[in-house]
Amino acid sequence: MKFVNDATAKDTAFIKCFPDDSGVYARILTETELDTIRVKSRTFNGNEKRTPELMDRRFKILHLQRALSGWEGLEFEDGSPIPFSKEMIKELWEVNPNLMGIIYSCVSSELSFVKAAEEKNSVTGADA
């Protein structure tokens, strides 16, 4: 079981990704966090070949590792729950990129919608 403090809970939203109501807990990343992820996703060892696909995959893995704080309803084929961890995010991307691609799409689209709404409210003074 993972415990979340009040600050994390306030900034985190549950995002349903699948028809069975399974999904993830995620938060909006700051521009600084996104910039850091962009730089890290472009950093390679000397023996690695840099490709746009690899940089994109690295960005998405790092984004999910930073934005997610947990998930509900994700199970292995035998029905046992998949434990949440940063390592598991990377491992799942390696073995089931379609699943993680769906999760990334849900998270990025939902959080960009929330961020746009927050920016609109802050410009109009609705949060004052």
Task: Tell me the role of every PLM-derived stretch.
Residues 10-20:
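Short acidic-hydrophobic surface loop/beta-edge motif
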Residues 1-12:
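Short, intrinsically disordered N-terminal pre-domain segments
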Residues 22-128:
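Short, surface-exposed, charged amphipathic helix/loop patches that serve as local interaction elements
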